[in-house]
Amino acid sequence: MAKRDDRSNNPERIENIIGNTLQNMDEARDYAKAHSEELSEEEKQEIEQKNERREQSIDGLREELKDEVNDQKNNS
C-alpha cells in the first residue's frame, strides 16, 4: 500500500529553504568582500551571478509558500 503524501510541513520546509538560501547569499557576499583583493573579476562575477540565481529561486519559493499556505487553509 502506498504511503500517504503528507505535505503538512511544506510551509515550514520552504521557509527553512528560503532562510538557508538567504544565509548562503549573505555568506557569499561577505566572502567576496573579505577576499576581494584575492579574487579575480571572473570569480567575483560568478559569485554575483550565483546570488542572482539564488534570488530567483527565493522568488519562486515565496510563491510556492503562498500556494502551500493557501492550500492548507482551503483544505482545513
Swiss-Prot record:
One Pfam family per UniProt: Tlp
Region feature (Disordered): 1-76
Protein's GO biological process: asexual sporulation; sporulation resulting in formation of a cellular spore
Stretches with biased composition (Basic and acidic residues): 1-15, 26-38, 46-76
InterPro entries: SASP_thioredoxin-like
Keywords annotated in UniProt: Sporulation
Places the protein is found: Spore core
UniProt key word Disulfide bond: no
Keyword Cytoplasm: no
Induction remark: Expressed only in the forespore compartment of sporulating cells.
Family, as annotated: Belongs to the Tlp family.
NCBIfam families according to UniProt: SASP_tlp (TIGR03090)
Name of the protein this chain belongs to: Small, acid-soluble spore protein Tlp
